[in-house]
Amino acid sequence: MDTTRARKLYNLVMKTASDPRHKKRQDIVQLLFSYSFLDQKINNEKAKEIISKLGEIDTIIADIAPEFPIEKINKVDLAILRLAIYELQFEKETPPKVIVDEAIELAKEFGGDASPGFINGALGKLLKK
């Protein structure tokens, strides 16, 4: 890898890691992940809003990834998709490209090897609709 490309990659990683919005998204993914196992009280307002719309969000997931039933999707990937779909479909404050890029970064941080591709494919399909 050449020096310029390495520097750009380093700056991208450092920007994402130090960005307070990224940290908030990390926290929400962790809350949504734990909520999928324990029906617990959530104190984060955005996470509460997402949970209140899970029926609608999960219907969208079933539509964009029909080969993956909700109950079979990795819980980390599901939490990331739920956050991204909420931001894309209900919040609409952040540009779609930023939301997708953030979701892919979260998948790289928290998910398995196939997670970034799965998240990218599902959200790409949603954006084409």
Walk through the language-model features, giving the residues of each.
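N-terminal interaction/assembly modules
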Residues: 2-112, 116, 121-129
